[in-house]
Amino acid sequence: MNSLSNIDFSKLSLFESIIVASQAIREDFPSHSVLTELKNRIKEAESYISSENEPDRKLEKLLQLFYTQWNFGGASGVYKLSDTLWIDNVLKTRKGTAVSLGIIFLHIAQSLKLPLNPVVFPTQLILRADWINEKKWLINPFNGEILDQHTLEVWLKGNISPTAELYENDLYKSESITVIRKMLDTLKAALMEEKKMELALNVTNLLIKIDPNDPYEIRDRGLIYAQLECNHVALTDLIYFVEHCPEDPISEIIKIQIHSIEQKKTILH
């Protein structure tokens, strides 16, 4: 397991960061077999697209290989959200989320020198390919489909607000650290929902390493500590949140939680 103190995301690629983060969260994360499988898939992809000369045709063939031949795609039926986020599991089942599928596809495409970048759109991760003629493709990592402006506007209105509008900066390339945070935030929520509190705590500690003073991450860590009955440290974190975000409506709920923990401590003593 990687020590949190040794991780420096600024020196790692997006894919390396996700592997290192997964090792830090899960002792049994099989990074060697994940890297070996991806190396083999990159070799296969290189051969599959080699008959094409133009980058856009190469990317078209890679999309066909990934989503049709290899059959990667979104999960359906009954499943645990965390199972669709762990990269080792996604490689095994070929079912993932926009962010996990996007990270795998992006790693393969970039290894093949294709001009693809991540975009943390307000509703989900999308992939952006920029071509020499200034045209761009926006790709849905769930299924490999090319997205048009109308679809993106519908997503915004359906998920954010009926009055939401699509702005150019919604489609700007995102920094790796933004994608990592998106992935870790989703994973943390999934693990908390699944009551895997020790793993959720590891995720939260990683997020706090990225932004040590984020009161919302500190609040979540406090809530996880409370679930684990580590009441002393839970109180410290929850009080920090209330002091730093007094105007947040959630603060009133957190104050009740603080009072409940303090009552428990009084009874125990």
Swiss-Prot record:
Domain of life: Bacteria
Residues in coiled coil: none
Pfam families to which the protein is assigned, alphabetical: TPR_9, Transglut_core2
Family to which this protein belongs: Belongs to the UPF0162 family.
PANTHER family, A to Z: F-BOX ONLY PROTEIN 21, SI:DKEY-261L7.2
Protein's name in the database: UPF0162 protein BU173
Organism, scientific name: Buchnera aphidicola subsp. Acyrthosiphon pisum (strain APS)
Organism phylogeny: Bacteria, Pseudomonadati, Pseudomonadota, Gammaproteobacteria, Enterobacterales
